């Protein structure tokens, strides 16, 4: 009698299922050297961004003697460190947000439909994996890809939908968005 393979097991909650259609983007690959008694020992470091293009994204770094092994390690780490980002209309951010990591600072702005992804290389990979189609992003400070990606994730973690903000404050979504009736005039308040 043949056994059916079980799902789950040790650490099973961290593993991705087959139907998760993840997109992975290689942000950078770098040759690094470890100096040992007999000379230098070379290895490769990879930075990978993984996302489902529906609001989940993660990044990971991996290092190994061979390039494919470094990419595999980075991809596995990225899959384990995924975050969910709320998106407006499934195409952009709900609000403008800034984030920083080390000397890297990024500013992310929501954009109108048809704007596209206006962002530098490492940030572009994050947005494409995330599934954001319209965003304007600017990187200030460092141009180091690792710090840019980490600063972008710091900014994305600060994003919140109006519903989340309303629940946190104990208010209605209409109060957060400023769509109240002003003294019975029938006009929506713009500056609340």
Swiss-Prot record:
Keywords assigned: Ribonucleoprotein, Ribosomal protein, RNA-binding, rRNA-binding
S-S bridge residues: none
Keyword match Ribosomal protein: yes
GO biological process per UniProt: translation
Domain S5 DRBM: 22-85
GO molecular function: rRNA binding; structural constituent of ribosome
PROSITE patterns: RIBOSOMAL_S5 (PS00585), S5_DSRBD (PS50881)
GO cellular component: small ribosomal subunit
Function description: With S4 and S12 plays an important role in translational accuracy.
Entry's family note: Belongs to the universal ribosomal protein uS5 family.
NCBIfam families cross-referenced by the UniProt entry: rpsE_bact (TIGR01021)
Record comment regarding domains: The N-terminal domain interacts with the head of the 30S subunit; the C-terminal domain interacts with the body and contacts protein S4. The interaction surface between S4 and S5 is involved in control of translational fidelity.
Oligomeric and partner information: Part of the 30S ribosomal subunit. Contacts proteins S4 and S8.
Protein name as it appears in the record: Small ribosomal subunit protein uS5
Organism: Gluconacetobacter diazotrophicus (strain ATCC 49037 / DSM 5601 / CCUG 37298 / CIP 103539 / LMG 7603 / PAl5)
Highest classification ranks of the organism: Bacteria, Pseudomonadati, Pseudomonadota, Alphaproteobacteria, Acetobacterales
Gene name tied to this protein: rpsE
């Amino acid at each position: 009698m043949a056994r059916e393979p079980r799902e789950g097991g040790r650490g099973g909650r961290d593993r991705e299922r087959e139907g998760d259609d993840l997109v992975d983007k290689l942000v950078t690959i770098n040759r690094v050297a470890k100096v040992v008694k007999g000379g230098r020992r070379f290895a490769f470091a990879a930075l990978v961004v993984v996302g489902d293009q529906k609001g989940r994204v993660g990044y990971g770094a991996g290092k190994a003697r061979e390039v494919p092994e470094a990419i595999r390690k980075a991809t596995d780490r990225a899959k384990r460190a995924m975050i969910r980002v709320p998106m407006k209309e499934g195409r952009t951010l709900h609000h403008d947000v800034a984030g920083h990591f080390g000397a890297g600072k990024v500013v992310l702005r929501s954009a109108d439909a048809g704007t596209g992804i206006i962002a530098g290389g490492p940030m572009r990979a994050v947005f494409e994996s995330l599934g954001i189609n319209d965003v304007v992003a600017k990187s200030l400070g460092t141009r180091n890809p690792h710090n840019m990606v980490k600063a972008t994730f710091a900014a994305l973690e600060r994003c919140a939908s109006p519903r989340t903000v309303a629940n946190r404050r104990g208010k209605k979504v209409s109060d957060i968005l400023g769509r109240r009736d002003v003294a019975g005039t029938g006009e929506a308040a713009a500056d609340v």
